[in-house]
Amino acid sequence: PAFMIGAIRSLLTIAPAFILHEIAHKIMAKRYGCWAEFRADPSGLRFGVIFSAITGWVFMAPGAVMVLGRTTVSQFGRIALAGPVTNIVLWSIGAIAVLAGYVTGLESNITNALLETWIWGNGVLALFNMIPLGPLDGKKIKTWSDTVFWIWLTIAAGTVYANIKILGPILGPMT
């Protein structure tokens, strides 16, 4: 039962974080006249399912949006930035909901559990994708602009810091 509850919780919180992150890439790519399509990676999905079953933590790389077309370095960087920015916006919505629930007293165990996974999922996804290595967004953003990269890396790291120091204590111990 605990695994099923965790799976449902992740489906409601982590799946939107990932899906909207990828849709943001596609929307920006289309804006620049590029072809963009999600490509599944079964090995990343298998790894994620096994990792989650063993550790209880959700970490999946089920695929990514592939972009084809003529873009400038700036456009490609902006396409990459759309994903982490989306996660930071989603994290902000969750953070506001946590604070609103705390201030008004309209919080519940179920809501807190969902918000906890929401803020952690979006914060970590934004920060992870800002790593400037391999196929991750951070590398494309840094290639485009060091300044933009460092600003958004700092913001993404700030979401995780806020989860630990501010929002985590409000929500209570991880469930």
PLM feature spans:
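Hydrophobic transmembrane alpha-helices and their immediate loop junctions
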Residues: 1-175
